[in-house]
Amino acid sequence: MSVTVFNPRIDDAAASDITAVTPVITALNELSSAQAPVEKAATKKVFVTTQGCQMNVYDSGKMLDVLGDSHGMEVTHNIDEADVLLMNTCSIREKAQEKVFSELGRWRKLKEKRPDLVIGVGGCVASQEGDNIQKRAPYVDMVFGPQTLHRLPELYDQSHQQREIAPKNRIGTVDVSFPSIEKFDFLPEPRVEGFKAFVSIMEGCSKYCSFCVVPYTRGEELSRPLDDVLAEIDSLAAQGVREINLLGQNVNGYRGEKDDGSICRFAELLHYVSHVDGVERIRYTTSHPLEFTDDIIDAYAQLPELVSHLHLPVQSGSNAILAAMKRNHTIDVYINQINKLKAIRPDIHLSSDFIIGFPGETDQDFQDTLNLAKELNFDHSYSFIYSKRPGTPAAELPDDVSFKTKKERLAEFQKVIIDSTLAKTHEMVGTTTRVLVEQVANRHPDCLIGTADNTRTVMFPYDVDKMDEMLGKIVSVRITDFVSPHMVKGEIEAVLA
């Protein structure tokens, strides 16, 4: 998945940072009244393309924030008018590196036409490849990792200095180190438009699943201090955000330090967030079954702000494959967790991640995965054919499942999930659901659109003259019609918050 992030977060004050300033003449009375006015320097524009997970979407927003705060840059939708091109990369899938270099090849043509264009590569591929990116693509000016994106202004300045010193033999700047979680100390105050926001509460992962590159590209788990997380959420809520999505590679493994030095675990954090004025809905991703503890499950009984949707990756329905993946839990443990949650929230909607065709996966292993999907009736899933990732333990295993078999199994599995998605959306008709109202429908100007707890888009008619006052409200909508697998239509019943 590749998403271009257009998030204009730059305030007017930041734009003044790059205004040309009239030289100061210290000798009094020497300033000529006839002095010609100095024109403002043109505002630089930045274009960001984002691959991969929601953590990357969050990071891309922060890239825009830091460059706006430091250099007054503005985001652009048009790559042809950009002064800076940033690619935030993902290395989860096979051939991720080649996709990056393919896109960079297209960007090279732009730079040939505009030599002053600055190109930067960030994210997990940048962490993996490091200075190899500039060896293969010497026209790249900046390479930075997820933990060093706060240093973008410095890297940008260094790239300009390199041009001035050695325009023909320029050496780009590379910073893919794993400092502590310091980047959050250097990021500007969060700015957002809309009623939803991501908040990163931790970085990295220490689970070391055999197939996964995340511990190698984002480092070990590091949790942000509790006060820092709550301060960011307070700021977002003050800007009108109603839904907070807590992010982390292993988000429910959060262990943030409190003022007194004690540790705040994830379930306790959920309670703190629920008490922030203005926050009406809480989501989180991505979770690990090992950290999905009873106190988190109990929170679903205690906190109405927690949406009735859970994304809990399981990866396979076979205990043998889970062991090979080093997931360190069994299917029985996973099913027991889900059953406990359903006892508390019968209307909970589940989604998960699945890897099909992992090395050693037999027909029975795959059948176990199909059986799990049918038993738990997942709402949707992110399912992929296994991709060998260099440097991971699984890459050393014999890849003994043919590509043809992998494709056939994936198609069969995805049909089970698609059928479940369709059935669950149809089941919404005649029920009432909670919706965050977000915008006027583009194609139906007499209707408002919002998101239900279960991630479905909900459209409902409303008085055109009063639509603005409904934006950002939490409403109850009775569903009347199925529109598509991920969209329904209904009638508003009440304003809840």
Curated annotation (Swiss-Prot):
Superkingdom, taxonomy of origin: Bacteria
Note describing how the cofactor binds: Binds 2 [4Fe-4S] clusters. One cluster is coordinated with 3 cysteines and an exchangeable S-adenosyl-L-methionine.
Subcellular location per the Swiss-Prot or TrEMBL entry: Cytoplasm
GO cellular component: cytosol
Limits of the Radical SAM core domain: 191-423
CDD domains per record: Radical_SAM
Cofactor(s) annotated in UniProt: [4Fe-4S] cluster
Binding site for [4Fe-4S] cluster 1: C53, C90, C124
Record's keyword annotation contains S-adenosyl-L-methionine: yes
GO MF, one example: metal ion binding
Domain MTTase N-terminal: 44-161
Protein name: tRNA-2-methylthio-N(6)-dimethylallyladenosine synthase
